[in-house]
Regions:
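Metal-dependent phosphoester-hydrolase catalytic domains
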Residues: 3-14, 20-131
Length: 131
């Protein structure tokens, strides 16, 4: 991505997936240079990370030992933030955690409703909420 942005600072880039790290981890904040500060995104050719907002609110995509993490993230380049971009534009990011995706009872109440646990099929969807 850095070489694309060097060649074309207005490139439309969406970087999304399970990064196995929170927005504050070194791999995201320092290596990817993903930030919530749009000014830095435009000036330094780095990525915007809208997922930090959820992390700061304690809302997550995955839960382990009662600690929520935002390891599933979306990052976008400055090209998608520019007001004049008429073809593609970043609108918003979110964590899709509707009731049917949430475990209703038991030890993992409130966690994402998993497909499998302990080798047993539970009928759920994933151990992460989609973004």
């Amino acid at each position: 991505m850095d070489s694309i942005l060097r060649q074309n600072p207005a490139a439309n880039i969406v970087n999304m997936g399970d990064f196995n790290d929170n927005p504050t981890n070194k791999s995201i904040a320092e290596v990817l240079k993903a930030t919530t500060k749009k000014r830095k995104v435009f000036k330094n050719k780095v990525l915007y990370n809208p997922m930090m907002t959820f992390y700061k609110q304690g809302v997550g995509t995955a839960c382990h030992r009662d600690t929520w993490s935002v390891i599933d993230q979306i990052h976008v380049s400055a090209g998608l933030l520019k007001a004049g971009n008429t073809e593609w534009k970043f609108w918003k990011a979110g964590i899709y955690n509707k009731p049917f995706l949430i475990t209703k009872k038991g030890r993992y109440k409130g966690y994402p409703f998993r497909s499998f646990s302990g080798g047993r099929f539970l009928g759920g969807y994933s151990d992460h909420f989609p973004v």
